[in-house]
Amino acid sequence: RRVDIEPNLLTSGTATIKGQPTGYIYILATESTAPALAALKGTGKLVKIGYSTQEVRERIKNAENDRTYLEAPVRLLAKINCFNLNPQKFENLIHAFLYQQRIHISLTDKNGTTYHPEEWFAVDRDTAVAICEKIVDGTITQYRMDKVQGVMVKKG
């Protein structure tokens, strides 16, 4: 699997009003006490990476009632302001780069329905932020994920 960044992919169809971001990439940690998450939480390598076109605090205010956030409170670890780029496309690139780090677990929601979280990854905050930086500066193609360690490493 690889990530190719096409020219203007991140900026197509977006324009920032002076001083206002087009959206945000956010990196969250969960406060969930689900036993299936305990081992990952213990390593410090469990983050949700998402995007929002509204303020992140507004987006996550009802996390306890949303399976997207594992029906638990979340902590904001990082917020990246997106200026003159499409935050959804940016998120898609991040998720593609982290494909091998996506967690594969089943959880049961408050209604007893089984679900599979999709935007949660077995990486730490610093790795997630570094990936975002490398996508923005155009050097992400020089890196790959070490799937065992869950860190980004330079190719070659």
Language-model segment annotations:
Residues R1-G156:
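Non-catalytic accessory segments flanking enzymatic or RNA/DNA-binding domains
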